[in-house]
Amino acid sequence: MRQSYLKNAALLTGSDVVLRLAGMGLRIWLANELGGEGMGLYQLVLAVYSLFITLATAGVSVAATRLMAEELSGPASARGAARGMLRRLLAAGLVLGLFAAALQLATADLAARLWLGDVRAVGALRVSALGMPWMAVSAVLRGFFIARRHVAPNVFSQLTEQTVRIALVALALTRTEGLAVGVRCMLVLGATAVSEAVSALCMLAFYRRDARSAFAGQKAVRPADPARRLWEILWPVEGGRVLASALHTAENMLVPACLAVYLINAGGRTVALEQYGELKGMALPLLTFPFGLLGSLSVLLMPEITQAHILGQTKRLNALLDRMLRLTGYFSVLAGVLFWVWGRPLAQLLYQSADAGFYLETLAPAMPLMYLESMVDGAMKGVGEQKAAFRYSVWDSILRIGGVVALLPRFGMKGFLAVILLSSLYTCAANTGHLLFSSGTQHAFRRWLGAPALAAVLAAAAGMALRKLLADGFAARLPLQLAALGIGGCATTGVFLLAAWPLGLGEEAAALWAAHRPGRPKK
């Protein structure tokens, strides 16, 4: 069992890293093809698009995982009921997917004109709606395979989806140079819709192969009270996530509009959209990219945190939370140091954008707060505190919207950076405080952030000195720029690890390996 668990964890983590690398590469290429204004328009479309994705998939994905796990955990003689439940879940997914697609198609013109304030978004909104039914079907089948503890179908379908998306986007944009930004954004979203269809077809092929063994060859029969069980999961999850997504969409629509007020005499809407694209489409994806490497820590620790909570093992739960917070602190502080020292040359290399480099440098100190908040959010759900996590998330969105409206018309992008920093502080403090209180864990901020911060000071000092020495390399051709960044990043990381290892990082790494090494007998 442990061998299979570690194999699945390794497969999920490895595929997540590959997918994130591919997605990051695609974003970098898109930024250079579309430019700042084009990325701003693309991000605006994604803000509305994500709202309808949530409507189509959020509730049915959770319902599929939970209900199929319940049905498949029963006796083998009841597998016909499991097949019947899956059919009902697929029907519910199709209904939600078609409804979301129809609603997005019907409101595309209204959303572009009134919500986004840019009619160029109409085509992209319309074509992206065509992928909704396929996404809903994929969400249900993904939940089925998770319930079966089969990760390979999900991994393969996601890799295929990303490959098809990259190929189609590259084909479309290389043949449409010089066309309007709105048309090119429409082609990118069209490629995404096609890739979603391909992914769903892959999942269906895996399902056909897996169905006989999963259901023991039994025909579908009506499961016990399917409508009530589905509805009890669907409406609170769907309602909560759609509300959170709607608030997030509202914030993203307000940012360019409020920036345009500040920039009314300096380019107005066009410059506002460009600045928005440089932050949301260039800088923030780079800042959040390293978080994918924490996936292995999450995969290993979250099930144990949930188990310790369910069994009432308070000491074990406290130890696991302490380890999670300590390791996340070290990793996030290292990532923050790297972006603070090397963010400007990295942005110049990837995007030829000084503004994106400024955003990376400014937000880098907040990375420990961002990463801790994300890990704590997952842990809160693992100990049954998801309502509190959702409540803090909603309040954070409301406060961010208020901050955008109050600060951006007066201070421009600096005001938005302040909103992001204050938001990170609030969500991290609120979620972490609630988790520690509800679990009875004593705070140890010196261990979680103090020791990493000490190592960060030494690494940052070494990194800044090295950056001055390598300044000529950043003004040279691409190979030398890559070499300078690689040497600088590796050297900074090395100094951090050498400083952090005796401060507790070595102790935690050894304990984590001892607890999860292959061949260790399960307690």
Where on the chain are the PLM-derived regions?
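Signature of the first transmembrane helix
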Residues: 4-62, 101, 105, 131-132, ...
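Short runs within selected transmembrane alpha-helices of multi-pass transporters and secretion channels
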Residues: 19, 27, 58-65, 127-146, ...
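Interfacial/gating helices of multi-pass transporter permease domains
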Residues: 30-51, 181, 185-189, 225-233, ...
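Helix-loop junctions and terminal segments of transmembrane helices
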Residues: 58-73, 287-312, 321
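Alpha-helical transmembrane segments of multi-pass membrane transport and lipid-handling proteins
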Residues: 87-114, 318-369, 401-402
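Membrane-proximal transmembrane or re-entrant/amphipathic helices at the cytosolic face
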Residues: 465-523
